[in-house]
Amino acid sequence: MAAALSLRAPFSLRAVAPPAPRVALAPAALSLAAAKQVRGARLRAQATYKVKLVTPEGEVELEVPDDVYILDQAEEEGIDLPYSCRAGSCSSCAGKLVSGEIDQSDQSFLDDDQMEAGWVLTCHAYPKSDIVIETHKEEELTA
């Protein structure tokens, strides 16, 4: 029995199952991927967002899944961003959110006022929409 699934937002599908033969991921429109598992599949829709990083060297865009920290994805793609603790408890990776929404509930350094003002720690920030972040902002945050 075959089933069809149609998504109209920036989603990708992941197959989650016990080890079993898998069919390779196939690219689809808008950089989406669909995975098909032969047996025992449980599929979970995962949003992927466009993240524009404005660095002192220029702008770079990447796609970041909603369950991956922005710093981790940037490193995966060879983008050099500042960091120190990677625990959300310092300001080395501080940036300023220009547009969009993020979830940084895992961090412990920024207070509510700083987060409302747009400050972000890229080491503990998940995208929740397409976003623009100015990076390398530790000095401005701590001034």
Curated annotation (Swiss-Prot):
[2Fe-2S] cluster binds at residues 85, 90, 93, 123. Binds 1 [2Fe-2S] cluster. Its cofactor is [2Fe-2S] cluster. GO terms for cellular component: chloroplast stroma. One of its GO terms (biological process) is electron transport chain. Keywords: 2Fe-2S, Chloroplast, Electron transport, Iron, Iron-sulfur, Metal-binding, Plastid, Transit peptide, Transport. The keyword Iron applies. Its main location: plastid. Residues 1-46 form a transit peptide. Coiled coil: none annotated. Ferredoxins are iron-sulfur proteins that transfer electrons in a wide variety of metabolic reactions. Belongs to the 2Fe2S plant-type ferredoxin family. This is Ferredoxin, chloroplastic.
